[in-house]
From Swiss-Prot:
PANTHER family on file: CASPASE RECRUITMENT DOMAIN FAMILY (PTHR14559), CASPASE RECRUITMENT DOMAIN-CONTAINING PROTEIN 9 (PTHR14559:SF3)
GO biological process, one term: antifungal innate immune response
Keyword list, A-Z: Adaptive immunity, Coiled coil, Cytoplasm, Disease variant, Immunity, Innate immunity, Isopeptide bond, Metal-binding, Phosphoprotein, Ubl conjugation, Zinc
Notes on how activity is controlled: Maintained in an autoinhibited state via homodimerization in which the CARD domain forms an extensive interaction with the adjacent linker and coiled-coil regions. Activation downstream of C-type lectin receptors, by phosphorylation by PRKCD and/or ubiquitination by TRIM62, triggers disruption of the CARD domain-coiled coil interface, CARD9 homooligomerization and BCL10 recruitment, followed by activation of NF-kappa-B and MAP kinase p38 pathways. Zinc-binding inhibits activation by stabilizing the CARD ground-state conformation and restricting its capacity to form BCL10-nucleating filaments.
Modification after translation, per record: Phosphorylated at Thr-231 by PRKCD downstream of C-type lectin receptors activation: phosphorylation promotes interaction with BCL10, followed by activation of NF-kappa-B and MAP kinase p38 pathways. Phosphorylated at Thr-531 and Thr-533 by CK2 following interaction with VHL, leading to inhibit the ability to activate NF-kappa-B. Ubiquitinated at Lys-125 via 'Lys-27'-linked ubiquitin by TRIM62 downstream of C-type lectin receptors activation; leading to CARD9 activation, followed by activation of NF-kappa-B and MAP kinase p38 pathways. Deubiquitinated at Lys-125 by USP15, inhibiting CARD9.
Binding, Zn(2+): D3, C10, H73
Tissue expression as described in the entry: Expression is restricted to several populations of phagocytes, such as macrophages, monocytes, and dendritic cells. Highly expressed in spleen. Also detected in liver, placenta, lung, peripheral blood leukocytes and in brain.
Name listed for the protein in its UniProt record: Caspase recruitment domain-containing protein 9
CDD domains: CARD_CARD9
Native organism: Homo sapiens
Gene: CARD9
Function: Adapter protein that plays a key role in innate immune response against fungi by forming signaling complexes downstream of C-type lectin receptors. CARD9-mediated signals are essential for antifungal immunity against a subset of fungi from the phylum Ascomycota. Transduces signals in myeloid cells downstream of C-type lectin receptors CLEC7A (dectin-1), CLEC6A (dectin-2) and CLEC4E (Mincle), which detect pathogen-associated molecular pattern metabolites (PAMPs), such as fungal carbohydrates, and trigger CARD9 activation.
Effect annotated for changing R57H: In IMD103; reduced cytokine production in response to C.albicans infection
Record annotation: effect of changing R373P: In IMD103; reduced cytokine production in response to C.albicans infection; does not affect NF-kappa-B transcriptional activity
Length: 536
């Protein structure tokens, strides 16, 4: 087993790998083999495994190495054989040789029966570990299935939430589009109202211009009439003007009067010398009296003519005022007629605008009513779609719950079946193993690794159980039968058929129970709705 004859030299070689050994080795695995090799007594084993001072695994391994080092070369060989059995890679690293699994130390110490007992103990431990792992795998498988069901439920809820979000976004987009359309319609209505107001203002301005032109025309007609009357007056005055013959006669009379005045002046100058005569005095007195009378008559005539001129002026002024008043009255009549026509036109326009306003209000109310009906129908349809979606989700949840219950039942049945198979295999494997089972631990380790690989790859947990059972059948072909004498395939088929029948019956019972519960819930819901409506 070792090329070193000196004990110190052997253990000095192992001291070079002490760090690696303490970090890799588990003392609880190699102590049974060392105890069978009689290099480790129960007290030492209890000290290594149960000492409260040795809590860390590395310290336990260090104490174990120190105890084995006290046994010398025998402990060194037993330790290497334990490494060869349980840690072949570490054995190859320490010794540089491939593990041969000769087990000379345990054979020399306890014989082949001790080796067989050790291997049987290890096999039982591994079988128990395999059972624990299979139970753990089945529970993990059930937990994974439950998680898948929960994941499907979560995805369903997420899809529903996403659908509700999409519906909400679609509704918001529709609302935004309706708002934009309403805003566009309002803008168009405002533009049309502005255009209509501008057209009305232009129409009013044109009407005012027409009225001003009419007024200007009437003023021009009045001015024309006044000028015509003045022209007629001037023509009448020109017609009443004295003629040339009358003017010539008046000029002759004037000349005669001037000549007479000159004669009188001459006679007056000649008679200045005879002023003292009474006749001349009488004449002068008469002349003065006549002159005074003439002056008075002239003054009277002048005053009468002045009064006449003033009366004529007043008459003319009154006539002009009368004509002016007549013209103003005519203008006022025409203005009143114009304003009356304008007011009538405005009233007609207001009546037309009121009719158009009533029509627009009626159209708007009708459109609002149609929009309200459309919104009510849309809300009713959305409510119906939401109720149908909720019903579909509830049905889907019921389906998922049924699947989860079925999976749980399958898991329980599988565990029961596994327990029955394990119990039957334990009963069948009560006889002693053959020597060819010496390589079983390594094969079981390979089987465990392959099972873990299958589980990590998404395989079914039934595969390692089937492989283990097939291996047991191949190793013990004469013990493969069950206590009833039936082959395992037929027994498995029978169990599967009974499980299928049980699952169908259970599913039918659950469906009937769910239908009854749903009918009772609907009856209770309709009853509560009726009571609510009656109470409202």
């Amino acid at each position: 087993m070792s090329d070193y004859e000196n004990d110190d030299e052997c253990w000095s070689v192992l001291e070079g790998f002490r760090v690696t050994l303490t970090s890799v080795i588990d003392p609880s695995r190699i102590t049974p083999y060392l105890r069978q090799c009689k290099v480790l007594n129960p007290d030492d084993e209890e000290q290594v495994l149960s000492d409260p001072n040795l809590v860390i695994r590395k310290r336990k391994v260090g104490v174990l190495l120190d105890i084995l080092q006290r046994t010398g070369h025998k402990g060194y060989v037993a330790f290497l054989e334990s490494l060869e059995l349980y840690y072949p890679q570490l054995y190859k690293k320490v010794t540089g040789k491939e593990p041969a699994r000769v087990f000379s130390m345990i054979i020399d110490a306890s014989g082949e029966s001790g080796l067989t007992q050790l291997l049987m103990t290890e096999v039982m431990k591994l079988q128990k570990k395999v059972q624990d792992l299979t139970a753990l795998l089945s529970s993990k498988d059930d937990f994974i299935k439950e998680l898948r069901v929960k994941d499907s439920l979560l995805r369903k809820h997420q899809e529903r939430v996403q659908r509700l979000k999409e519906e909400c976004e679609a509704g918001s987009r529709e609302l935004k589009r309706c708002k934009e359309e309403n805003y566009d319609l309002a803008m168009r209505l405002a533009h049309q109202s502005e255009e209509k107001g501008a057209a009305l203002m232009r129409n009013r301005d044109l009407q005012l211009e027409i009225d001003q032109l009419k007024h200007s025309l009437m003023k021009a007609e009045d001015d024309c009439k006044v000028e015509r009357k003045h022209t007629l007056k001037l023509r009448h005055a020109m017609e009443q003007r004295p003629s040339q013959e009358l003017l010539w006669e008046l000029q002759q009379e004037k000349a005669l009067l001037q000549a007479r005045v000159q004669e009188l002046e001459a006679s007056v100058q000649e008679g200045k010398l005879d002023r003292s005569s009474p006749y001349i005095q009488v004449l002068e007195e008469d002349w003065r009296q006549a002159l005074r009378d003439h002056q008075e008559q002239a003054n009277t005539i002048f005053s009468l003519r002045k009064d006449l001129r003033q009366g004529e002026a007043r008459r003319l002024r009154c006539m002009e005022e009368k004509e002016m008043f007549e013209l103003q009255c005519l203008a006022l009549r025409k203005d009143s007629k114009m304003y009356k026509d304008r007011i009538e036109a405005i009233l007609l326009q207001m009546e037309e605008v009121a009719i158009e306003r009533d029509q627009a209000i009626a159209t708007r109310e009708e459109l609002h009513a149609q929009h309200a009906r459309g919104l009510q129908e849309k809300d009713a349809l959305r409510k119906q779609v939401r109720e149908l979606g909720e019903k579909a989700d509830e049905l889907q949840l019921q389906v998922f719950q049924c699947e989860a219950q079925l999976l749980a039942v399958e898991g329980r049945l599988r565990r029961q079946q596994l327990e029955t198979l394990v119990l039957s295999s334990d009963l069948e494997d009560g006889s002693p193993r053959r020597s060819q089972e010496l390589s079983l631990p390594q094969d079981l380790e390979d089987t465990q690794l392959s099972d873990k690989g299958c589980l990590a790859g998404g395989g079914s947990p039934k595969q390692p159980f089937a492989a283990l059972h097939q291996e047991q059948v191949l190793r013990n072909p004469h013990d493969a039968g069950l206590s009833s004498g039936e082959p395992p395939e037929k027994e498995r088929r029978r169990l599967k058929e009974s499980f299928e029948n049980y699952r169908r019956k259970r599913a039918l019972r659950k469906m009937q129970k769910g239908w009854r519960q749903g009918e009772e819930d609907r009856e209770n819901t309709t009853g509560s709705d009726n009571t609510d409506t009656e109470g409202s």
